Amino acid sequence: MLSSKLLDINYWNKFGKRLINELINLIEQIPKGYVTTFKELAKALGDPIATKFVAMYYKKAPHWYRVVSSNLIVSPMQKALLEKEVKIIGNKVYAPIFKDFKSSKPLLELQKIQEYLVNKIKFDYPEYDYVIGIDIGYKNNIIALAIFDKNKKLIETKTCKHNIEFPYIPTYLSFREGIPIVNILKDLDYTALYIINGHGLSHPRKMGLATFVGTVLDLPTIGDAKKLLYGKIKNNIIYAHNMPVGYFVGHYVTIGNRTNLEFLKEFIKEWNSKKYLLPIEVADKITKCGRGDSNPGRD
């Protein structure tokens, strides 16, 4: 039942709308005379990391002006609406912070899926005939695949359209990008190693985009990202969850699924390029032609 849900793009697009509606509902629970913060709303959704999501969508609620930053400073427009309800001196609010939200905490549902998939992670020395780089762009809704043979010869490139409506929330990128990637890869007939523009085990719940795709489809995957999402670096080795999970080589290359650290080191020596591993560098160029730099982030 879980696997069929993970393949259903419409289900996850609806879930994304549910998140936005839940946020609106939470804001409308704030009584007159109270305010709340972005962080309190994120916690009510199930994870304080969702503050950026709250900041992106809170103005969809009729009483959005009751949501303030943690320093309680408000904008002139917000002040004009809020000063009829609470005390404001200068541009600072003096009012009780509402925290008693009634919420279904939808982000906890996503965490449970991530925790379930963690049990499917495998460490292996993969066998493959092709190496496929995968990147997603948003301007023209493109997923790009750069397909190489083992001799680093580019065999072909593919582009597919996607219809992603799930919002961007840090550490939940798999439910935004992983679902359409899984739907494309499940129909490919390649014995391949997949390099995905995102993270692997360097994720708070070991479930970066590369690990998500790898565990759902039981494929060998590697994550390759510009920035470190989670963990620490010592001597160019990336550590997360008290174990080495990858290497910093100007970008962050981490184990996704069915690979291991020794294999990763050998693969990087052969396939590293200027900005990314070669397959991602090619896929990234394809999506940039269509999207510019509008992608909000990479998990």
Curated annotation (Swiss-Prot):
The keyword Nuclease applies. InterPro entries: Endonuclease-V (IPR007581), MethylDNA_cys_MeTrfase_DNA-bd (IPR014048), MethylDNA_cys_MeTrfase_DNAb (IPR036217), WH-like_DNA-bd_sf (IPR036388). Residues 1-80 are annotated as: Probable methylated-DNA--protein-cysteine methyltransferase-like. GO terms for cellular component: cytoplasm. The record marks 168 as: Interaction with target DNA. Mg(2+) binds at residues 135, 197. Keywords: Cytoplasm, DNA damage, DNA repair, Endonuclease, Hydrolase, Magnesium, Metal-binding, Nuclease. It is found in: Cytoplasm. Its cofactor is Mg(2+). Its EC number is 3.1.21.7. One of its GO terms (biological process) is DNA repair. Its main location: cytoplasm. Pfam families: DNA_binding_1, Endonuclease_5. It catalyses: Endonucleolytic cleavage at apurinic or apyrimidinic sites to products with a 5'-phosphate. GO terms for molecular function: deoxyribonuclease V activity; metal ion binding; RNA endonuclease activity, producing 5'-phosphomonoesters; single-stranded RNA binding. Residues 81-299 are annotated as: Endonuclease V. It is an enzyme of class 3 (hydrolase). DNA repair enzyme involved in the repair of deaminated bases. Selectively cleaves double-stranded DNA at the second phosphodiester bond 3' to a deoxyinosine leaving behind the intact lesion on the nicked DNA. PANTHER family: ENDONUCLEASE V. In the N-terminal section; belongs to the MGMT family. This is Bifunctional methyltransferase-like/endonuclease. The lineage of its organism: Archaea, Nanobdellota, Candidatus Nanoarchaeia, Nanoarchaeales, Nanoarchaeaceae.
